[in-house]
From Swiss-Prot:
The gene is lldD. Catalyzes the conversion of L-lactate to pyruvate. Is coupled to the respiratory chain. Substrate binds at residues 24, 129, 164, 278. Keywords: Cell inner membrane, Cell membrane, Flavoprotein, FMN, Membrane, Oxidoreductase. Residues 1-380 form the FMN hydroxy acid dehydrogenase domain. FMN binds at residues 106, 127, 155, 251, 306-330. GO terms for cellular component: plasma membrane. This is L-lactate dehydrogenase. It is a peripheral membrane protein. The keyword Lyase does not apply. Its EC number is 1.1.-.-.
Length: 383
């Protein structure tokens, strides 16, 4: 199969993965309207083509916090990445290091902080939810610091898990889910051998380390559901801000007022995000939400954005809308599932080449030159 885009990697991943895993990463909340709009609204942003601009060499690098990145891209935190390829978090982290960008380890990863650190050293980021078990939160923050993590991504848009209809149909949840997953693995022998058997242990590495017992995938949904805390407020995060001495990013901002409060709270950055359309269906796409947020907090903190990004062109669009850098999640998981570490590296090369073409044809030499003037019109998003 010829692979030339994220969409090709998606097709390859769909063939290779058992349905319960493919649809878990591919699906969204409820009727998936927001998930679809995330992509559609980005495509509605027309780039402003310019000619004879003497562009020459294009510089894709940026400085993000204290890191120099080769691309304005960060691999987003994705739970259970280690189920999409054998020791998937390690492979994705190695690919990110090879391409000079950060990898963000999810707190509900298969591979633990210690395992990832042993493979790639320091420099990766870590993601954490607000959970009822404050002991776990403190413990994992201490372990992440010892592993060399200096950037914490705090997910704030998940006080309760979103309802994802696809999961019940695919076997991730619903009646006879365990039996259905076993049957799916039988008819996907490559995944069953390479990941299902050779990729063990399949536990939540960071949680198991804290509880000192194996937390299997069967326990995954129950453990998360029991620990999400819908009663949290800004004051509940203050101890974390005081405790954590590194950079702190709040992920899941969609409203300008919340962005202002993030500045007042002392966040170093935000991720404008609707969780890839996986939490509350019917909310604004990131492409729609981003400009108003950028208008009120640009210069006060670093702005990242995710949701709907499938190409280097989409990265340029997000930056033109006000982002300093972009996170990608589904896209790199498709590549990881299809071709492992090399797949993620190839995907990032595709993104880089697409960015170079887009920047050259819009007349900009460096990422910092991408502005709202790089867009021809946003009328389609403002109707």
């Amino acid at each position: 199969m010829i692979i030339s885009s994220t969409f090709d990697y998606r097709k390859a991943a769909k063939r290779r993965l058992p349905p319960f895993l493919f649809h878990y990463i591919d699906g969204g909340a409820y009727a998936e309207e927001t998930m679809r709009r995330n992509y559609a609204d980005l495509q509605a942003l027309a780039l402003r083509q310019r000619i004879l601009r003497q562009v020459g060499e294009v510089d894709l690098s940026i400085k993000l916090f204290d890191q120099r990145l080769n691309l304005p891209i960060v691999l987003a935190p994705v739970g259970l990445t280690g189920m999409y390829a054998r020791r998937g978090e390690v492979k994705a982290a190695r690919a990110a290091v090879a391409k000079g960008i950060p990898f963000t380890l999810s707190s509900v990863s298969v591979c633990s902080l210690a395992e990832v650190h042993a493979e790639v050293g320091s420099g990766f980021w870590f993601q954490l939810y607000v959970l009822k078990d404050r002991g776990f939160m403190r413990d994992v923050l201490e372990r992440s610091w010892l592993a060399g993590v200096r950037t914490l991504v705090f997910t704030v848009d998940m006080p309760v898990p979103g309802a994802r209809y696809r999961d019940a149909h695919s076997g991730m949840s619903g009646p006879y889910a365990g039996l259905r997953r076993i049957l799916q693995a039988v008819v996907h022998p490559h995944w069953a051998w390479n990941v299902g058997i050779m990729g063990r242990p399949h536990d939540l590495g960071n949680v198991s380390t804290y509880l000192q017992k194996k937390i299997t995938l069967e326990d995954y949904v129950g453990w998360l559901g029991a620990n999400f805390d819908p009663s949290i407020g800004w004051s509940d995060l203050q101890w974390i801000r005081d405790f954590w001495k590194g950079k702190m990013i709040l992920k899941g901002i969609l409203d300008p007022q919340d962005a202002r409060e993030a500045v007042q709270f002392g966040a170093d950055g935000i991720v404008v995000s609707n969780h890839g359309g996986r939490q509350l269906d019917g909310v604004l796409s990131t492409a729609r939400a981003l400009p108003a947020i950028a208008e009120v907090v640009t210069g006060d903190l670093t702005i990242l954005a995710d949701s709907g990004v499938r190409s280097g062109l989409d990265v340029v669009r997000m930056i033109a809308q006000g982002a300093d850098a972009v996170m990608i999640g589904r896209a790199f998981i498709y590549a990881l599932a299809a071709a492992g570490e090399k797949g993620v590296m190839h995907l990032l090369d595709l993104f880089a080449n697409e960015m170079r073409v887009a920047m050259t044809l819009t007349g900009v030499r460096a990422v910092k030159e991408i502005t709202h003037e790089s867009l021809a019109s946003t009328d389609a998003l403002n109707q």
